[in-house]
Amino acid sequence: MEDKVKLSFDGKDFEFPVLKGSENEKAFDVSELRKKTGLVTLDYGYLNTGSTKSAITFVDGENGILRYRGYAIEDLAEKATFPEVAWLLIYGELPTEAQLMRFRTMLTENALIHENLLHFFREMPPSAHPMGILSSIVNAVGLFTPRFYDDDNKADVFDLTTVGLISKIRTIAAFTYKASIGEPF
């Protein structure tokens, strides 16, 4: 028998399904609440509301728990490299040695940004916040990387786009820092 939560309002009973999360925590699905009852929920600070189902992240702030794909963040920070964690987040498991070597190579091969993006860095106000610069340049990357929009082979495009963007963000962050301290790129 499927678990349900019963809500009584205005003399009527309504049922909502109970779901299990990635850590077997229980929640009830209120996505049909307004449609069924005319009611909405109010959750100050979003403390009791999950925004979506996630197989990637589990957060329990009250108990200090953060996991990515079932791995404690403390373990990943201590034992895994950036490319290993990136692979884990993208593909759902830690990479094999061969996958990791290929991924590292792809990150290196895709680190360069288009030369015309340097104009964006030069035109940013010196007082601009680094996150504002980073997000602006990330948005501009697609203008100079048309292969990110190639629909011929969606799996390859996903891999290239994902690796390309992860790799370029490292370069963009470095350039953003150089710009913030007034040094040339």
What are these regions (language model features)?
Residues 2-185:
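Hydrophobic alpha-helical bundle cores within soluble ligand-binding/oligomerization subdomains
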